[in-house]
Amino acid sequence: VYKRQPWYGLDALADPRNILLGLAVLFLSRVLGLLYFMNNIDEQSIFDRSRRHLRWNAAAFVATFVAFLVTLLLARGWAVDPASGRISEEPYKYLHNLLAMPVVFVLLVAGILSVLWGIAEGLFRRGRRGIWFAGAGTVLTVLCLLLTAGYNDTAYYPSLTDPQSSLTIYNSSSSRFTLYVMSIVSLLIPFVVAYIWYVWRSMNRVRISEKELGKEDHPY
């Protein structure tokens, strides 16, 4: 997409939305880490420190994510004509996508509210289960943002120098054989998810504590 420019894609840093998204991901990672500590470490001093750091990290995340989401919904996008394949600019394209896909819109709102609920669980209720709400909400929100960027005849990776070279679901898909193989392999995903769930549940069955770490045969 940036092959004609000498910056090799680094000029994407000039787009404030990219900076806002990067900061939102950074602070969200810190928020999820703090919520994980609060849930899985049985030490009151660490719980209190995590809760204290959660305040400003959560505030920074909410501020940067809201700014990113607002600028995204108000930004122009690139629409694909399904008949001719021609790509043209469309104002408020991503907002139009959400309105055209009500299920995605509802799931996006649910994901955002779930993340906020997880943060509130740790901040105001002093609960330890905030990571479950925030983690599930993060997965749901990211999925909906990806669907908003690529579905509804949208160029998900637009070219700023040659719009007709933008990447879409139509022109970036693999061959029929590759898609067939990938669809077969994707049947393994539930087993992989179940394995990950089992391993993490086994690891987190007992909270980490000073006494637990003092054992020679601890499970870590």
Segments (PLM) and residue ranges:
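Hydrophobic alpha-helical transmembrane segments
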Residues: 9-28, 95-113, 172-192
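Short, membrane-exposed interhelical loops at transmembrane-helix boundaries
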Residues: 87-91, 157-178
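Short, small-residue-biased leader/transition segments that mark boundaries at the very start
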Residues: 1-2
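Hard-cation-handling environments
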Residues: 59-68, 72-87, 94, 98-99, ...
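Juxtamembrane non-transmembrane "cap" segments at the membrane-aqueous interface
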Residues: 142-164
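Hydrophobic alpha-helical membrane-insertion segments
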Residues: 57-71, 133-150
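Loop-centered beta-sheet repeat module
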Residues: 10-64
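Juxtamembrane membrane-water interface segments of multi-pass membrane proteins
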Residues: 34-53, 71-90, 113-135, 152, ...
